[in-house]
From Swiss-Prot:
The keyword rRNA processing appears for this protein: no
Lineage: Bacteria, Pseudomonadati, Pseudomonadota, Gammaproteobacteria, Pseudomonadales
One Pfam family named in its UniProt record: ABC_tran
Record: residues binding ATP: 36-43
Domain ABC transporter: 4-249
Organism: Pseudomonas aeruginosa (strain ATCC 15692 / DSM 22644 / CIP 104116 / JCM 14847 / LMG 12228 / 1C / PRS 101 / PAO1)
Protein's job: Part of the arginine-inducible binding-protein-dependent transport system for arginine and ornithine. Probably responsible for energy coupling to the transport system.
Chief location of this protein within or outside the cell: membrane
Domain of life: Bacteria
Protein known as: Arginine/ornithine transport ATP-binding protein AotP
Amino acid sequence: MYKLEVQDLHKRYGSHEVLKGVSLAAKAGDVISIIGSSGSGKSTFLRCINLLEQPHAGKILLNGEELKLVPGRDGALKAADSRQLQRMRSRLSMVFQHFNLWSHMSALENVIEAPVHVLGVSKKEAIEKAEHYLAKVGVAHRKDAYPAHMSGGEQQRVAIARALAVEPEVMLFDEPTSALDPELVGEVLKVMQDLAQEGRTMVVVTHEMGFAREVSNQLVFLHKGLVEEHGCPKEVLANPQSDRLKQFLSGSLK
């Protein structure tokens, strides 16, 4: 059984179709990197998986359980069961490009927020878990700091700890290093590599070709809302079949 399965996902904005039937399947421990040019639909696809964006067609399954979707007035699909959506979202955590930490909360408070208020974990247990994950990503010493007083790399590592604190079955990363200064990228990629080596199931939208090649076991190249190529990262990157991917890599691959 797949941990995460997305079938024939479509999304449009007005008459512009951003996703034209994208499918993806991740087994336990898979690390899938999604690459592509700006505007290819990468981030939209990721955001549709947990309904931050509403798709217009397709199926989303987590551990074989299908997310129940019904058409809304605008034609987009919405959750038919809000409790199911909340439960599935807690098993499908997301790390955002711009961190999305609560500015009025400390690092520790950011990490315990969802376990306490969404999952109903006791505050004592949530704090113990938060301190564990903050230490795991190397920012235990910053637990009382507020986002404005942290570097971008520290904020993103706190965001990863926050995502881990709900004990997710699948982690989604939306260009987690693209908002960072170049010297801070490595510290975040190292945390992600460690998570991959632990056997975490991860779907990563990224421009970091080294990570895609060395850490992922699947690579997806999206172009204009369609999967142009999909396969073993080292093989796809070393021997691209499509002219579009060759052109993309000529400007991206270091």
